[in-house]
Swiss-Prot record:
Keywords: Antibiotic, Antimicrobial, Disulfide bond, Fungicide, Immunity, Innate immunity, Secreted. GO terms for biological process: defense response to bacterium; defense response to fungus; innate immune response; killing of cells of another organism. This is Thanatin. Insect defense peptide with a broad spectrum of activity against Gram-positive and Gram-negative bacteria and fungi. No activity against S.aureus. Stops respiration in bacteria but does not permeabilize their inner membranes. Disulfide bonds join 11-18. The keyword Secreted applies. Coiled coil: none annotated. It comes from Podisus maculiventris. It is found in: Secreted. Four regions are important for the activity: the C-terminal loop, the last three C-terminal residues, the stretch of seven N-terminal residues and residues 8-9 are necessary for the antifungal activity and dispensable for antibacterial activity. GO terms for cellular component: extracellular region.
Amino acid sequence: GSKKPVPIIYCNRRTGKCQRM
């Protein structure tokens, strides 16, 4: 079976925001 590439989520602890890399 083929798996979808898992999006890497980077969370910045300073701003408290998470963004996809």
